[in-house]
């Protein structure tokens, strides 16, 4: 179809595609590796005459198989072949109303997509729709919903169009518009049979996002970072092996099955190191200080690469958008008591980015306030800003050189910066000054034990939390209200 938003920008059939025997051998290797689910996609998988044979080979070996199609060739006969082969379901790409969908793809594409969904409905095959969202169609979601209900669609996946292939930057939605997608998906939860699904590129960690993910994703965490090369594998038409088919620049190709068995590629030392070895220390920008950085790891790597040319920071995040919307309001505040009150509440709710912003603002208004400096040092630490934590805590010690809490905070910051001897000295000074603080003494003994055992346990060290009586909450909507700051509450 040569779609205007296709991430592949394919013009003609590739000359180096795997042939049928190579594809079937690959199926055996995938099953042997313990793969549980395979999705056939493209391009357009139905352009291969052997697509059903590939699916059947996988199913025979206990692998669940589904497919993503544009629907043009997925007629009643193809649906029957998919069912006979054992496909669990099929997703059809549908990107708007007929006018918009055909403009993005080609005339007649909308009718073929709807016909494919109707054929699946009549045959009793599980169906899904995938909608790639951009400026062209973001406002069309409410108009699409009744049609999808009529076509018996069971799952509706919403994903971002990224500037790769034929997709141009001017049509990519703004980071602030991701919340529109999440809010719409959330509105579907109790409206009928269609299960909304957020693709991995849409997130992360706003309250609505967590509720949507929990409705279909069984896990302790709604999102725990990109799984490319960890539990996911991507295979290109020519047998190139990737962590994710969206991330396919030459430097991300781990090998080719025509030269190397899949198991060898997968288990090779150093394979997929760009993601397997990725850690919170590799983050930057907002993601570096985000409370969810250690588990989220910056969301979808492909979004970061296409939008920032780096894996460090992800602007397309609903939680980030909520927090950053508050920054101008905080910067306008001049009442130190209110800033401190909001900071304490934010710290109690582990919303460290907001606490840090409130305290930085308060510090510009009163730079010699010990309470502000102590809490700001703690907030910097929790935001993984260890040098800032050290600098601010040293300022606090200039005001109160015998303050045990500040010496403890300095010791933690120094340890994170790799200054182990200096960290231990600061901890000992804190212990000498904390004789009447049982909680702080307990924290200090634990941290000194970690320091003496070597730096392997430093990741478990934490400065003592400032005392607060405020309740904790994972509901960000109520949390923002409790703090007294929200996008709708100055």
Region locations from a protein language model:
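Radical SAM enzyme [4Fe-4S]-AdoMet core and its adjacent flexible, acidic
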Residues: 18, 84-85, 89, 93-95, ...
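Flexible mid-to-C-terminal extensions adjoining Fe-S/redox cofactors in radical SAM and related proteins
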Residues: 246-338
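Register position in tetratricopeptide repeats
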Residues: 348-349, 382, 416, 450-454
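Conserved alpha-helical substructure of the radical SAM core
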Residues: 1-88
